[in-house]
Amino acid sequence: MSRKYNTLILGASYGSLLAIKLLLAGHSTKLVCLPEEADLINNEGQRVRMPARGREGLIEIDSRKLPGTLTAATPDAVNPADFDLIVLAMQEPQYRSPGVRELLDAVAKSRVPCMSIMNMPPLPYLRRIPGLDCD
């Protein structure tokens, strides 16, 4: 690999799997999360358990044993301009939380490439589906 990328992921739950995959490729990743979660991740790393084809049960991948580096921080402790890619991996209500809302403003102003991994379509999309109560 010729270049290592520095990725910021907002959300340590949904963002964990992507973070692990980036670490496997040797990239650096910072997860944005609550203070208690950030302390735990910074002290003990992140573990993801998932099925693997051809294996019984789940495999566990420990971030501390991968070639990339993983850190975690609270929303007020990151500067989006320091990253090559920003990933939105939180559920919609979390983006209204104090600190996260301000971080999103900074993300927009940074003009850093941004992608979203969502667990469901956004409400404006869902409201267009006839017969679906979104209120």
Per-segment meaning from a language model:
Residues 1-3, 58-59, 86-88:
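N-terminal start-of-chain detector that recognizes signal peptides
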